[in-house]
Every structure is written in structure tokens, then in C-alpha cells.
Amino acid sequence: MISNRVNNIKPSLTIATNMKAQELKRAGKDVIVLAAGEPDFDTPDHIKSAAIEAINNGFTKYVPGKGTPDLQLAIQKKFQRDNNLDYELGNITVGVGGKHIIYNAFSATINSGDEVIIPAPYWVSYPDIVILNDGKPVIVECGEQNGFKITPEDLEKHINPKTKWLMLNSPSNPTGSMYSKDELTALGDCLLY
């Protein structure tokens, strides 16, 4: 009953590690859990109050898949104000989380056999998201000597006509390494071939 695509993905290492850590905690072990990336703070009160107010005011119906126009506009203004970036409203999409947005983007753009370059270490979900969309993850090891970041030379070695995406986030999950503007520009130059 399950599709072949789903049978090709592995169980979540994040969930498995988190479950093991919780098991050790229940057994009385002193464990610091770094697996699931759960914040160690509660949702701020003003956000909780706004959510409760929205529910009490009947804001409980379906909204557009890309987010409400008011939320898209608020995001557009935030990027203009805080980051000096101008985005068209049509280029702003709101999702339930990063994994959801990445999955949707790959679903819309990856064809069978397309390759996605993924610098390692990487967030454990990236390869499976590619596989679920019938693509091929291309893992590029990025060692400590480069700050766990992909270099233009390593990127160029892995780009080919089947390359559709470079999966790049800064700060990196899981290492926290950040790319400078110059590093991003150099990587961008490689992608313009």
C-alpha cells in the first residue's frame, strides 16, 4: 500500500536520537538533548495572546496556501526594514516550517534524475526530501578545514547538466557555520555557468 518512493527513505535519525535521549532521561540519566532542536524557551506571551485573540475572533478558516495577504505584506516590510531587501509579494510564501517549504519547492522543480548538491554535514531530512521527489542527492563532504562550508572548487567539481539545486543554508544546520557575502558571491558565480 505504501509507495516505492516512501520505502526508499530512512527513518528519521533526529526522532530516533531524541527518543533514545528521552528514554535515558526517564531512566534518571543526566542528558542534554541536542537531537530535535527544540527551543528551551516558551512561546513569548504576546504571540500566545495574539493567537488566542485570533481564535476568539473567528480567525479559524482556511487561508491561501501562500499565506494571508496581510502576513505576506508584513514579511515584505520586515525584509525591507531589517535587511534592505525588496521582494515582490508574489515571491513570498508562508509555510508551516522549513521542511514544508523545501519539500514544496523541490516538488515543483525536480524532475526524475535531477541532482541536488548537499554540503555535509547537513540537516538529516535533505536527502530524503530529494529522494521523495525522485531526485538524486549529491553529498559533498565539507570538512573542518573549510569551516564545514562548501568551497567554489568543490561545488564546481559536482555541477553537471543534471544539477538542479544547491541546498545551502546559512547559518548551517547542524554546524552553525555562516557564509560571508564574498563566499556566497563566489558560490553564486559557480552557479552561473
Which residues are covered by each model-predicted region?
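A short helix-loop-beta submotif of the ANL/AMP-binding
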Residues: L132-V138
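N-terminal small-domain helix-loop-helix segment of the aminotransferase-like
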Residues: I2-S3, N7-G97, N104
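Residue-level signal for alpha-helix termini/capping positions
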Residues: R26, N56, I110, I159-N160, ...
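Conserved PLP-anchoring active-site segment centered on the Schiff-base-forming lysine
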Residues: A108-V130
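Short acidic capping loops at alpha-helix termini that bridge into adjacent secondary structure
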Residues: D86-I92, S112-E115, K162
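Structural signature of beta-strand start/N-cap positions in the alpha/beta core
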Residues: D30, E115, K136, K162-W165
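Active-site phosphate-binding strand-loop segment of PLP-dependent enzymes
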Residues: V138, G143-Y193
